[in-house]
Amino acid sequence: MLIFWAVLGGFLLDALFGDPAWLPHPVVLMGRCISALEKHLRTALPKTPRGELAGGAAVAAVLPLGTLAVTGLACWAAARLHPALGLALQMLWCGQALAAKGLAQESRNVYKELAKGALPAARRAVARIVGRDTQNLTAAGVTRAAVETVAENASDGVIAPLLYMLLGGAPLALTYKAINTMDSMLGYKNEKYLYFGRCAAKLDDAANWLPSRLAALLWVAAAALTGNSARGAWRIWRRDRRRHASPNSAQTESACAGALGVQLAGPAYYFGEYYDKPTIGDPLREIEPRDILRANRMMYAESLLALVLGLAVRLMLIL
């Protein structure tokens, strides 16, 4: 029952408080470790494709295994001191592994600026949650970027960590976050990270394969619950779920596009370079700022569905 209560408590902590700025966050420490490992390995190993592959593989092995070992040991030690302390630590880390409230808050900030007609401020707000260049985006481009990141992060910021914590508590959820953080820092297909980041990207693809597909199916159900088009979500997911360089990113994006009846993705600039990405969905209507709020409602609905279904399965296995 420890994992059951840890997951439920962690979900409620995230829903109520999100990630307070004053509270140290494990992902920040993971980021510092990745940067330190990268700096050391780039210095120690040959600056060749093989050397960079070896360095990236070392990071991709050390960080997840180290995270699992350290967090697992910490949870075990806390539980040995007192069961309530062990549960409290697991709840805290489960809450920190989830990003539903933070994602909703950041995307809502984008909506607020767009609603005021403050395009420069909206560009700055969306730049906090997307990787693309935002300085020249139109209002529709800013809206599209925010909706896409809500849809994609519903999978790797909510459903995936929720699945892993249901399987192995906070240690496994934070191990997943370590893999996801590596990919966000190293998994670029540019000159700097083409080889060094390859293992991190492949590991993230593997870790997200099942969660992203579960998230897409849950998004279809969430569309029905929130008054959006479940039929459209299902149809566009079936058609466009592979229209992305990543095997996972278009899963929830396509379901979201279909649910809203808008077109997402398409060409974008990253670090000054133009990428001709395929579009996802049909432009049945023009995208509008309120679509950010609609995407958030679907994200919350699928999160609750995942929690209820996951805890129900967990309870049945225990009983």
Named regions from a protein language model:
Residues 184:
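Glycine-rich phosphate/dinucleotide-binding loop and adjoining beta-alpha-beta core of small-molecule
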